[in-house]
Structure formats: structure tokens, C-alpha cells
Amino acid sequence: CSLVGSEMCIRDSRSAELDCSMRYYNADGSAGEMCGNGARCFALFAEHLGIGGETKFFDATDGVHTAHIRRAQGPAGEIELGMINVSEIRSGDGWWFLNTGVPHYVEMVHDVDGIDVNGRGRGIRYDTGRFPQGTNVNFVEVTGNGAIRMRTYERGVEHETLACGTGATAAAIITNYALQHGTTKYRIQVPG
């Protein structure tokens, strides 16, 4: 991945029951369960190849997903991605842990810019006492009603990443859960 400047690689493997099957590999070569942003790109690529209908059905290591592509004029549009259900949320002193396809630690902070994402993130990511499989680490700042900023240390990439779709999902769930906003849509600002 470093030769082309990417953080991951996705491979399509055909499936008899579904439109396609996605396998995700991190920059360090390890297999990942899911990548939300990668899945959106994968669905758009499948559309480009003429695979499936307007709604794509595909599996990833974490389970079966759907991707519904809605086109606006030209290349613009929206991809609505069906993620796995979150079955459990664990919490500690100012942090939460959940799985949105991959494991995510979420910590609410007052100033996301003041966080040493690589230093703190690495320490939490490798805290096998709390997270035996390791975890992605998200630092989240609420900037308004329905608006948050997020920075993520990504497992497998092993440094801060510019954007993380499963992390954004985790951040929205935890912001709503922890603050009981009742908001179902969030605008999430990430570095990328």
C-alpha cells in the first residue's frame, strides 16, 4: 500500500448468493473486518462494472451489507450503506467501546485539536487488558447540535487516518447515546 500512498486494499471475490464480496486489507497487510468508506467506494466500483442493481448486496468479513446508490445530476450522489447492528456498548470513565463492523473506542474531548492522536491512540489501541483484539481509537468533540469533529487512530494503519467511516458511525452512535441528543443525523468533520 505504501507504494501507491494508500492505507488499504480491497479485493472483490465473487459470491453465488450476493452481488459481490469485499475483502479488506490494512496497510500493514493484516485482514480487516470492514471499512465503511472503502465499502462505499467498492459499491460505486461495482456499479461502474455493472454488478448488481441500484441496491448492491455484498458481504465483508463482519457480515452482509447493502449499499443503495442515489444519483444526483452528473457524478454527484449519495451512497447509503447498511452496517451491522451494534449489539453491545461498553463504557468506562469518559470512554465507550462498540463494534460497528470493526471495534471502536470513542472518547469525548473538549478540544480535538489538542489531542496527541498518535501517542494516545497507540496506547489505547494496544491496551489488550481492555481490548484483547485491539481497537480503533476515536476522539470526538461536539461542536453544536448534530455537529461533531473527530480524529481517529486506525488499527492496521497504525497512525492517525484522515477519515474513518465505521469510526464516524461509532462517534454518532456514542454522541447520541452519551448526550441523549435525540438527533439521528450528524455532520461529522474529519481531517480529510
Residue ranges and their predicted role:
Residues A27-N99, T169, I173-G192:
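Acidic, low-complexity central loop/insert segments
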Residues S30-E33, Y153-L162:
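Short pre-catalytic strand/loop immediately N-terminal to key active-site residues, enriched for Gly-Thr
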Residues H110-V157:
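A mid-sequence, solvent-exposed acidic-amphipathic segment
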Residues D93-I115:
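Internal active-site segments that recognize and position negatively charged phosphoryl groups
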Residues C1-G5, C9-I10:
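Single conserved hydrophobic/aromatic residue that forms the stacking wall/gate
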Residues D12-S13, A67-I69, V140:
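A structural signal for short hydrophobic beta-strand segments in well-ordered beta-sheet cores
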Residues G36, G101, V140, G165:
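Residue-level signal for inorganic ion chemistry
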